[in-house]
Structures are given as structure tokens and as C-alpha cells.
Amino acid sequence: MTDALNDEQEVDATLRAVLRDVLGLPEAQVAAFDESSPLFGALPEFDSMAVAGLLTELEERLGILIEDHEVDADMLESFGSLLTFARSKTLQ
């Protein structure tokens, strides 16, 4: 396994843990998320207040900085879009 693959898997696992911890979602629900699983607007737990907590927790756990101008509805739309964003931030 390459370091890049390990890093991608680590970001995936971290994102799932953050979604579980911040939103209070069941482990089984989070484990079942795939790239197309809808998030913002589809999960009642994922409201505007939860977005702030989720992004703060991602910053802390991944050691990244998320700028306000980077946050938009497209990035929060699905598990896949949020995962792609988080992975891109870890590469910067």
C-alpha cells in the first residue's frame, strides 16, 4: 500500500468519525455512507449550526485550515464531495 492510499483511507476514517461524533449519527449509518450519500439538507442533524462544529473538528483532527470562502453548499452536498474537499486540504 502506498502512503497516498493510507492517507486517503485515514481522511475517510477521520471524516466518518467526525460525522458520527459531531452529528451523533449511529456507527452503522456512517459506515454505510458512500460517495453519493447526501449530507447537508438530507440529514436533519446536519444543520447550519452543525456545519460550524463539523468544520472545526475536521480542522483539528486533520490539521488543516478551512477558509470561510471555501465553504459552500456543493462541498457539503454529499459524503463524496466533503471527502474530496478534505483530501484536497490535507495535500496543501
Which positions does each model-derived feature cover?
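Phosphopantetheine-dependent thiolation modules in NRPS/PKS and related acyl-activating systems
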Residues: 2-46, 50-56, 60-92
